[in-house]
């Protein structure tokens, strides 16, 4: 929902065990709204910790249309208005009565994916979010805000060409009875009222589920929990998982390789990053429940490198 992805160079630092990043992530120029140069981590005091950060703010519609065209160029059929009603073994039933069969079925439909609902009973933490697109000039620094304005989650301002993507995500159990709408309205109003679009959704924040494969069924992306909880990164992480899944499926069909190789290769490439991110989010969720004045003290030049380790999924260090 935030439309932000790290540059390829940032991805190589964030996910050092992922091979051929440049081959995987080939975002076309027309789908890039802005290139960012900094990330500001902002406590309640408003005094940010500033870090160099190369990011790409996407035109999400253009980006997703490009992905569709790329898939079609490789032989995929793209169906619109095709709602999945049921998945049973090798059969997929649509709401309009059509039925498809396949030796392998991949669920890539987000955290409410119908394949996951049918065959997986593992629950995940989902953070409700609300965001807007707003016209204006907001600089070129990405902002992540922490504290009582977004209990258990964070708020963001991601600048775009001629505007920004601004939003809030919270954990309801820490909201003390206040609604997401109240938190979002209060935060968004800080930046003005030139709203051109408003949206809402939820973000899976438990990290990856225990298994991605059941018989001939695979999950990828948000459906498999492929979001880094400590920073919300999901687009590029899902593309990493999607490539591994695709390569495994080809190997399975051609050489009868076990589909569970998908899970093993994911752990080789992303296991340590995801573990660190889960731990950082768990610790961070506790820290962010502290009073704002303590958070303000915690965000200082001395702690600056350690805060960055939390966000970038490295093993967190804690100083007492």
Predicted regions and their residues:
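FAD/FMN-dependent oxidoreductases across multiple families
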Residues: 174-249, 254
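Short hydrophobic core segments
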Residues: 84, 92, 99-111, 217
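Conserved FAD-binding catalytic core of PHBH/FMO-like flavoproteins
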Residues: 110-180, 185, 209
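A conserved beta-strand/loop element that lines the FAD pocket in flavoprotein oxidoreductases
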Residues: 72-84
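Helix-loop-beta segment of a Rossmann-like dinucleotide-binding subdomain
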Residues: 42-59, 91, 160-172
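N-terminal FAD cofactor-binding segment of flavoenzymes
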Residues: 1-39
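Short beta-strand to alpha-helix junction loop
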Residues: 49-70, 114, 172-179, 208
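C-terminal helical "tail/cap" subdomain of flavin- and related membrane-associated enzymes
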Residues: 247-320
């Amino acid at each position: 929902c935030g439309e932000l992805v790290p540059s390829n160079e940032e991805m190589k630092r964030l996910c050092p065990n992922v091979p051929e990043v440049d081959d995987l992530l080939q975002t076309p120029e027309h789908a890039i709204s802005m290139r960012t140069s900094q990330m500001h981590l902002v406590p309640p005091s408003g005094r940010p910790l500033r870090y160099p950060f190369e990011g790409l703010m996407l035109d999400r519609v253009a980006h997703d249309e490009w992905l569709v065209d790329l898939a079609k160029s490789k032989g995929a059929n793209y169906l619109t208005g095709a709602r999945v009603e049921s998945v049973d073994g090798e059969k997929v039933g649509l709401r309009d009565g059509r039925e498809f069969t396949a030796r392998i079925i991949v669920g890539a439909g987000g955290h409410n994916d119908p394949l996951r609902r049918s065959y997986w009973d593992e629950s995940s933490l989902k953070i409700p979010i609300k965001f807007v697109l707003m016209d204006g000039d907001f600089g070129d620094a990405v902002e992540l805000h922490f504290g009582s304005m977004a209990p258990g989650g964070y708020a963001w301002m991601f600048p775009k060409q001629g505007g920004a993507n601004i939003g809030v995500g919270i954990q309801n159990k820490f909201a003390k009875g206040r609604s997401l709408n109240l938190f979002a309205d209060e935060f968004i109003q800080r930046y003005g009222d030139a709203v051109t679009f408003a949206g809402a959704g939820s973000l899976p924040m438990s990290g990856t589920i225990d298994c991605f494969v059941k018989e001939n069924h695979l999950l990828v992306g948000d459906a498999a929990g492929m979001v880094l909880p400590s920073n919300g990164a999901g687009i590029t992480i899902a593309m990493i998982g999607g490539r591994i899944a695709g390569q495994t499926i080809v190997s399975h069909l051609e050489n009868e390789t076990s589909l569970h190789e998908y899970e093993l290769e994911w752990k080789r490439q992303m296991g340590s990053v995801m573990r660190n991110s889960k731990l950082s989010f768990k610790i961070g969720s506790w820290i962010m429940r502290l009073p704002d004045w303590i958070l303000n003290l915690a965000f200082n030049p001395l702690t600056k490198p350690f805060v960055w380790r939390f966000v970038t999924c490295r093993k967190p260090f804690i100083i007492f």
